[in-house]
């Protein structure tokens, strides 16, 4: 790890290393003290443009006044209402809001993305009385054992851990097609192989509860599939009596311009998982479905903190803010601006930037060697150079940098952040 920015940061990092479990991955020693909007300030007073939004969590911006006020007002009444045992208004209001935004009329609350996926897995297995799943190479759905079975982005996530039965298919990664085909002439063979290969040779659809898929692969590299990919997955689910589960944990809450990213592809899943931006900084996850599917009896599934009153109040305020401020339209507008600037940089640095892809403010920049192969080392150096220059960048996939700033980022902040990103590229290109 590089040297922390200042003395307070250095001291806190040292204490952290002495006490916190070493399993966490930190790309650089940023020690945050406060943040507002799209600006983070560290413990030594240095400010950074946040292009990561706490891993796509702070869509409404850090320290959003309306969210803060809602949390404070609820805290003065009660923090935890034991929603798994009793009743309360805040989580019910939140569920009603989610129904209005999505059309799903049943909601299960939990605390995180991985828990929302676990609930989706259990619901699909319970409803269809089947125990197997189909996932995708490059997917990330969490690190608890059920969701980890679906996760297939890095082997270090899975080594030594038992898993439930999941067969993985190829995702629609057209820039590096694993089947060495060309879109659109490929006929979406990656998705078709679920039916033509997996369901014929390895896993009967009669034993399959669900196909679980991200609208855009997140940790796998911010990979945007062609529209027909999800449409083909939907067809396969329909024709084989299998549920389609959409993991909207990272892509949801207007990040791609629509409340649910699957809307961009004209597809509606049977079960939806949400978290991250849903809680506006507080731990909150939700699993959504229809009343026809989510009809499991009391005691089938539960958790102590699901429907937490503070998280529910924060989420409702955040959703109301997103809707009123039309953050979906803003994400599309600023996303177009980011994509234009980043593609200009790609044309100037073709030996470093291989691909720019995204929807709304969920954008991936794939870093390559001059021969076009992945270059994770240079990717990591760019991320660190960005930190030194005052921007927060996050890696994903094998060789990609993600751009997922708060949806409230100003154009001036966006320009500053992109200028600093270009400076990082320039520094490394001069070294080469």
Where would I find each of the regions flagged by the language model?
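Conserved N-terminal phosphate-binding loop of PLP-dependent enzymes in the Aspartate aminotransferase
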Residues: 1-432
